[in-house]
Amino acid sequence: MGARNKARKRAVDVLYEADLRGEDAVTLLSGRVGSPDLPPVNEYTVTLVEGVTANRQRIDELLVEHAEGWTLARMPAVDRAVLRLGLYELLWRSDDVPPAVAIDEAVELVKALSTDDSPRFVNGVLGRIAGIGDRLRSTLRGANPGAE
């Protein structure tokens, strides 16, 4: 598993734990950075957790809009964490992470961590959003110049 794959997995772990505990993911992660009892935290993990947290309201709005027939509360918590991370990479990290890679990485994460139905669900939701990704990125940049 490459460094970015590990960073994504660790970010999902933090996002998942924060979601279950009702805590802020950045605060939870900051307690782990530099901890002598835990493995070092990859810089990309920090980037992902901070990015998802900073854009979580918009990410969640997009997920609800494009997860046909699903609410966030109805989704398995792992799927929510992976979708949030995948959507962040898809829309806010597109200069660095090609859309196909963002989707594939998210699907691989849920294959390893969630239900048998999760890969198809995550692929479908992120695929629908990727189809309008250019328009969404343009809108996001207009609302937040310099964001990416």
UniProtKB/Swiss-Prot annotation:
GO biological process, one term: transcription antitermination
Full protein name: Transcription antitermination protein NusB
Pfam families named in the record: NusB (PF01029)
Keyword Mitochondrion applies: no
Coiled coil regions, renumbered to chain: none
Cellular compartments per GO CC: cytosol
Keyword Transferase in annotation: no
A single GO molecular function term of this UniProt record: RNA binding
Bilayer-spanning residue ranges: none
Family membership: Belongs to the NusB family.
